[in-house]
Amino acid sequence: RLPVWIVSDLVDEGFFRFALPTEMGGDNASSMETIEVLEHLGAIDASVSWNVMLGSEINAMAVGGMDPELAKKIYLENPRVVMCGGGGPGTKPPRAERQKDGSVKVWGQNTFISGCHNATYCFIGAPLMKGDEPELGEDGMPIFKMWFLPRDQWEIVRTWDVAGMRGSGSDDVKTEGGICPAEYTGIDLFVTPAHYENPVYRMPVPLRLAYNKSAVALGVAKGALEAFSDIAQNKIPMLASKSLAHRPIAQFRMGEAEAMYRSCRSWLMETMEAVEDELREGADFPGAKTTQDARLACVHASNECMKVVDLLHNTAGTTGMRMYSPLERKLRDAH
């Protein structure tokens, strides 16, 4: 997890609010602006970028799925609010039950709740049950929701012990009969289109969940390029008299890696701009082909960035495998 002082500084500087609408105290960031912010952070530290990515993303998605008056109460009365949630189900089947006062009780343990240590609220997924049977919606399907629970209604279970992204704090979150207050039961994390003009609020949810993850990957690749450049200029390989930077193979691979990074970044930005252009023209959703291109660009960018880090780590030789090497950290984070 991130140290408390780092999270506090990030909150103070508005990193968890920049994607919110201006009327809710944010900067109303576009998808391209979001990518740039997260990429910059990711070049420094991927776990910091990932925490900001999840916190700012869920803050912004939640505001689109709640009544604007309730949103003012949550976001403007507490400028330091940070949200988390949306992970997978744990080993115990989750459930939620309506209460007589209109609230909902929730039981369950969700996995991969990145940034939970920083959060004021958590969205916990569970089906709405009545006895042993699921409640059905108007479409005849079981009702499954992400229930919005305040911090005192859930606990963190320390399960995050991994190779890469170690600082993301993606532990489990558990609740045993936690209360989702009646005024929060109408909040829908996945509403589109939402109440706000920013095209981001009319993007299909799978795309909205994709481009900012790719931004973190871009940051890792960018940081790897910077780290390798420093290594190449200062490392003199065994049995050599000049630095690694003088070797043609190092120059070739550095050029190859930079071309991979810059080309996948450019395509991602191009496709996200095309999505926003369509939405600015008044469409409720982007066209199928535009969405397909953007989703493909997101996946392509993430995969190419992993290859960039692999290539540079390999070219750095034994220097890259040392635990003190920034390339070693980039390798684990990229994967």
How would you name each of these model-derived features?
Residues 163-261:
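Glycine-rich beta->alpha junctions and the first turn(s) of the following alpha-helix
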Residues 4-12, 17-119, 134-135, 141:
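Glycine-rich flavin
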Residues 109-153, 317:
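DPxDG-like acidic metal-binding loop motif
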